[in-house]
Amino acid sequence: MFKKIMKGGHRKPSKSEANEPSSYGIGLPDNRSGPGSNVVVSHASRGALVNSSPSPVTATPPPPPLGSVEPLPLFRDVPVSERQTLFLRKLQNCCFLFDFTDTIKNARDKEIKRQTLLELVDFIQSGSSKISESCQEEMIKMISVNIFRSLPPASHENTGQEPADPEEEEPYLEPSWPHLQLVYELLLRYVVSTDTDTKVAKRYIDHSFVLKLLDLFDSEDPREREYLKTILHRIYGKFMVHRPFIRKAINNIFYRFIYETERHSGIGELLEILGSIINGFALPMKEEHKLFLIRVLIPLHKPKPIVVYHQQLSYCIVQFVEKDYKLADTVIRGLLKYWPVTNCSKENLFLGELEEVLEATQPVEFQRCMVPLFQQIGRCLTSSHFQVAERALFLWNNEHIVGLIAQNRSVILPIIYPTLEKNIQSHWNQAVHGLTTNIKKMFMEMDPELFEECQRQYEEKQAKSKEVEEQRQYTWKRLAEAAAERDGGGGEEDHMITS
């Protein structure tokens, strides 16, 4: 409750990245004029880029019209010739902004605005009357006034505490959602409407507008992010002219998240959009898209909050491999590069993703990376965390992966045989012990001669190690005896040299 009070009462000044020069080479267009064009959104924890020049002063949103919301007739109650004028008047009504922290204050006006927004949504959705260009411009201005705003700071910024686990952190729900939802619905209906001419609409849904939408993805409210995801996806699909810009702008968000903040609420939603975009990539794949995989998607495995967005990230990665199987080696080596060392839950996620990637991997690409891959799998097999060891052993339940292993058993079995023996001899978990025994039997049936050779080499190595250890102990014992004699026959215990 304290967090919500702090969020409601403490809002930091807006500093939109839309008005800053991009540090990743994306030029930004001039802002549109008119109400709402200077309305910006930012998050207090996502300030200006490191070492960037100071941001220009941003104009505040225009104040709403004076007076109260004016009750207006329904569209069906006026002649068709007057509906455009009525549409504009209703848009003006919806430019009033209200304080939703006080549920009683302006209750009548809030309800009038809500009903008006519902009418506007129905009017656009019905397509009963095509709206003019001036009406479209005013509608986008009204939408901008309502949705583009300063986001409340994250809870740890108010309290000074370390950021909590993203999965456990209670999201902040926008109090004005009863109005905000309808504004988003209106924008969505406008974008998807068959009556919307992209040649006209792109004047108002321009690069500046798209950037401000992207800023809003940092909202903690999952309902808002869901609408933003759908709307941006539809904009990407309908406005082909914006596609390269949208991809680059999303890249910028990812770069900042990976290399600077590791804090952003909308990474999962942005990855969902990209998953659909990747699915539509034409073949042969452009170099730009391959670089996106290498420079953005693979490094996204590094941040600590990966558990929040891993499902969407894994889908994007697998889409790339399914589109172009030659990328499998690059992806697998990328996973190995960022493989977690001490985080067992994260390691389980990596093993699950690895299985999906291997399912789409062809033999030639598999052979390129199988040595480092099975060295890592071997380490997972002997993990003291039984869930990690189990998850690694479950790879042998996949027929495609077993087929790849069988084709390259002469290389793979010598790598993992020692780990199989170690599990059988000393792993504390009975389930891991049983699964390891099954895999050992599988290799024995797959190639008895190779299995016996690996067993012989393992036994020889163990015997040699035992011999070396005995020799080491004997050497230390001789040194201890020599030291005792040198000191005049003193007690051996006082002069024992320990290894």
Swiss-Prot record:
<feature type="region of interest" description="Disordered">
    <location>
        <begin position="1"/>
        <end position="65"/>
    </location>
</feature>
<comment type="function">
    <text>The B regulatory subunit may modulate substrate selectivity and catalytic activity, and may also direct the localization of the catalytic enzyme to a particular subcellular compartment. Required for the formation of the PP2A holoenzyme that positively regulates brassinosteroid signaling by dephosphorylating and activating BZR1.</text>
</comment>
<dbReference type="GO" id="GO:0005737">
    <property type="term" value="C:cytoplasm"/>
</dbReference>
<keyword id="KW-0963">Cytoplasm</keyword>
<dbReference type="GO" id="GO:0009742">
    <property type="term" value="P:brassinosteroid mediated signaling pathway"/>
</dbReference>
<protein>
    <recommendedName>
        <fullName>Serine/threonine protein phosphatase 2A 57 kDa regulatory subunit B' beta isoform</fullName>
    </recommendedName>
</protein>
<dbReference type="GO" id="GO:0019888">
    <property type="term" value="F:protein phosphatase regulator activity"/>
</dbReference>
<dbReference type="GO" id="GO:0009554">
    <property type="term" value="P:megasporogenesis"/>
</dbReference>
<dbReference type="GO" id="GO:0005634">
    <property type="term" value="C:nucleus"/>
</dbReference>
<feature type="compositionally biased region" description="Basic residues">
    <location>
        <begin position="1"/>
        <end position="13"/>
    </location>
</feature>
<dbReference type="InterPro" id="IPR016024">
    <property type="entry name" value="ARM-type_fold"/>
</dbReference>
<dbReference type="Pfam" id="PF01603">
    <property type="entry name" value="B56"/>
</dbReference>
<dbReference type="InterPro" id="IPR011989">
    <property type="entry name" value="ARM-like"/>
</dbReference>
<dbReference type="GO" id="GO:0051177">
    <property type="term" value="P:meiotic sister chromatid cohesion"/>
</dbReference>
<dbReference type="GO" id="GO:0000159">
    <property type="term" value="C:protein phosphatase type 2A complex"/>
</dbReference>
<dbReference type="InterPro" id="IPR002554">
    <property type="entry name" value="PP2A_B56"/>
</dbReference>
<comment type="similarity">
    <text>Belongs to the phosphatase 2A regulatory subunit B56 family.</text>
</comment>
<comment type="subunit">
    <text>PP2A consists of a common heteromeric enzyme, composed of a catalytic subunit (subunits C), a constant regulatory subunit (subunit A), and a variety of regulatory subunits such as subunits B (the R2/B/PR55/B55, R3/B''/PR72/PR130/PR59 and R5/B'/B56 families). Interacts with BZR1. Interacts with BRI1. Interacts with SRK2E/OST1.</text>
</comment>
<dbReference type="GO" id="GO:0009556">
    <property type="term" value="P:microsporogenesis"/>
</dbReference>
<keyword id="KW-1070">Brassinosteroid signaling pathway</keyword>
<keyword id="KW-0539">Nucleus</keyword>
